[in-house]
Amino acid sequence: MKKSNLSQYKKNDKNKVEVTKILTRIEGFDDISHGGIPLGRTTLVSGTSGTGKTMFAIQFLYHGIVHFDDPAVFVTFEESPKDIIQNALSFGWDLQQLMDDGKLFILDASPDPEGQDIAGEFDLSALIERIQYAISKYQAKRVGIDSVTAIFQQYDAATVVRREIFRLTARLKQIGVTTVMTTERVDEYGPVARYGVEEFVSDNVVIVRNVLEGERRRRTLEILKLRGTSHMKGEYPFTITDDGINIFPLGAMRLTQRSSNARVSSGVQTLDEMCGGGFFKDSIILVTGATGTGKTLLVSKFLEDACKNGDRAILFAYEESRAQLSRNAYSWGIDFEEMEQKGLLKILCTYPESAGLEDHLQQIKSEIAEFKPSRISIDSLSALARGVSNNAFRQFVIGVTGFAKQEEITGFFTNTTDHFLGSHSITESHISTITDTILMLQYVEILGEMSRAINVFKMRGSWHDKGIREYSISQHGPEIKNAFHNFEGIISGTPTRVSLDEKRDLSRIVQDVKGLSDDDLL
């Protein structure tokens, strides 16, 4: 039975006339567009070279045929049909089979390599008739046109070309097909399109970008307008995977995940006690501190505890190799290789610079969907933050934490700070508000010797120890000791010894402020 390709997105206001939308089945796009693109209208997809415009159009047609049995016509003004078919195969889209089945027709309007002379006034009448004939013959519901910029480049009379393309879009709208038309733009944040195409194809405009941010390129998609209907505003990151375009609709995420009162162990008994019995099952934990403070050790204990209980776990490592991680863990009595052999642990080591943040996010989501772990660890977030903007990094963290919570997974992430001693920002990009629990590790100098300190800086929904405790690292792992009772100013990096007499004096001052006498306290 044929599936409905119409959007199920509805508005609550009964007085408004709703614009019917058609689903694209492009991952994430139907979320940010509130149900797809308007039925029977033309949508302009604009972007610089290499941003994914042609792929968007082909993916729209392919999914329409495969999922909804909507025949389609694709008009190409640039690439040859042979190249289009071959390129689509790399994504598993067998366009030739669809053509053989009579579901797809590719109309070749690409320029003649030998060139051509125009006698008389230029018009697209013959092409418009060919397109209309193909639509009628194949009973097409969807049309893709790639790209109208090529027409302007072939002919000098831009005003005449604009007029003819307006005729084409008007005819397509009259026929009632839903069209995706691509065009090029000069700059990522300049005019919407070259030659003023958006002036006559103005019902719907989508902009795709491939911007160099810092040291890496970042792909984003923005719906500039969908006339007569709602959509989400702003740019949304996307990547191109083996399955095509994959948009991450971070703004479409809803805080509707369930919250569990169940607890999971950190793998360190004293730390569990400091956290009121362990971490909440579906919480996100961030451990932050300078290099060498023991962050990866806590990650190892966290993963070991999961595997001891027969649960699966994934470690996404961006700073150390698998061999180095396994060696270090083994020195603390943790056998990562044995856990992997049992199928309980999966370690993925990647250089942060090997891909963009969107690609890393897609890999994390894919691995979670395939392996189905109950716990994940990322070591470290700060490595992924190198060379990218704060906004891009924050969106990445939101994507990871949102997906982990959706899947009810406990996440344990590390962050390396630049300061060895003293107070510091937990994270420069302010991601601390996204996490549920924050563990702060730091170095402290006490009586001329270097020590380590740990404290539970924050824990949502639970009592936790407020003390700053000393801890050391032995061959058995972390050993958390008592709090630094006789010192103050540890977090600021200037610990000062407080004598018992001074502590009594401070206590009396507090009592006087509260209006209490010694007799009242007895």
Curated annotation (Swiss-Prot):
The gene is kaiC. The interaction with KaiA enhances its phosphorylation status, while the interaction with KaiB decreases it. One of its GO terms (biological process) is regulation of circadian rhythm. GO terms for molecular function: ATP binding; ATP hydrolysis activity; DNA binding; magnesium ion binding; protein serine kinase activity; protein serine/threonine kinase activity; protein serine/threonine/tyrosine kinase activity. In the homohexamer the 2 domains (called CI and CII) self-associate to each form a 'donut' layer; the compactness and local conformation of the domains varies over the cell cycle and impacts function. CII has the autokinase and autophosphatase activities, both CI and CII have (weak) ATPase activity; CI has the clock pacemaker role. Residues 1-248, 262-522 form the KaiC domain. Belongs to the KaiC family. This is Circadian clock oscillator protein KaiC. It catalyses: L-seryl-[protein] + ATP = O-phospho-L-seryl-[protein] + ADP + H(+); L-threonyl-[protein] + ATP = O-phospho-L-threonyl-[protein] + ADP + H(+); ATP + H2O = ADP + phosphate + H(+). Central component of the KaiABC oscillator complex, which constitutes the main circadian regulator in cyanobacteria. Complex composition changes during the circadian cycle to control KaiC phosphorylation. KaiA stimulates KaiC autophosphorylation, while KaiB sequesters KaiA, leading to KaiC autodephosphorylation. Clock output pathways impact the RpaA transcriptional regulator. KaiC enhances the autophosphorylation activity of SasA, which then transfers its phosphate group to RpaA to activate it. KaiB and KaiC together enhance the phospho-RpaA dephosphatase activity of CikA.
